[in-house]
Amino acid sequence: MPELPEVETSRRGIEPYLVGHSIQYAVVRNARLRWPVSEQILALSDQPVLSVQRRAKYLLIELASGWIIVHLGMSGSLRMLAEETEAGKHDHVDLVISNGMTLRYTDPRRFGAWLWCDDLATSNVLAHLGPEPLSEAFTGAYLYEKSRNKRTLIKPWLMDNKLVVGVGNIYASESLFTAGILPDRPAGSLSKVEAEVLVATIKAVLLRSIEQGGTTLRDFLQSDGKPGYFAQELQVYGRAGEPCRACGTPIESAKHGQRSTFFCPRCQR
């Protein structure tokens, strides 16, 4: 599933082609995504694009009349293409832009979403989200305070969007490894020092992935059609049985909250 770095990479890639131009119209080949494509998107006509933002794993395209909210789901990606580029089997939504380009949404598994919102303050999907992990609001003190008396395992706890947004399966595993913290410890066992280290590590891992264009394990592509190169730097995720890059101990895996977790039993405590 595309996580925060992949969504931010997509945002940065499409923004220069959208802002200052207009969406002439939308082409929807298959409206049966996770939720049906909103009727307001189907009816778009000559709508100026004011900004392209991100909140958690949602892309927010601001128009003069409202907002398009895009979620990439499990396998979605966005590309900027020449308007005449022929569509493929899994290309479900196009936004035709006034500069001769098309924003194309590809999603083999169709778990993504294209929604409309008149006002973000009233959006149900954006309500109750925690702070952005790269913001000043996400601090060691915040994480430590939230962890008090929590028996939930650290790994699934970090993936709760009410705690902090955008730290998905890949980056939770990678951050815990880099911070030297076992994923199956209770969240309440974090010390103040560990909370500070973990927050700094999460920020560093996410920023590094954004620099590398995100992580491509299967379907994700950047807006220019290239894969995300952070996959080449993964320390533990998807490496069960392979030697730890730091100590040589075989990487282990476990199921936490029905999600696969990867860790080094020697480097993490």
Curated annotation (Swiss-Prot):
Its cofactor is Zn(2+). The keyword Zinc-finger applies. DNA binds at residues 90, 109, 150. GO terms for molecular function: 8-oxo-7,8-dihydroguanine DNA N-glycosylase activity; class I DNA-(apurinic or apyrimidinic site) endonuclease activity; damaged DNA binding; zinc ion binding. Signal peptide: none annotated. Its EC number is 3.2.2.23, 4.2.99.18. Keywords: DNA damage, DNA repair, DNA-binding, Glycosidase, Hydrolase, Lyase, Metal-binding, Multifunctional enzyme, Zinc, Zinc-finger. Disulfide bonds: none annotated. PANTHER family: FORMAMIDOPYRIMIDINE-DNA GLYCOSYLASE. This is Formamidopyrimidine-DNA glycosylase. It comes from Serratia proteamaculans (strain 568).
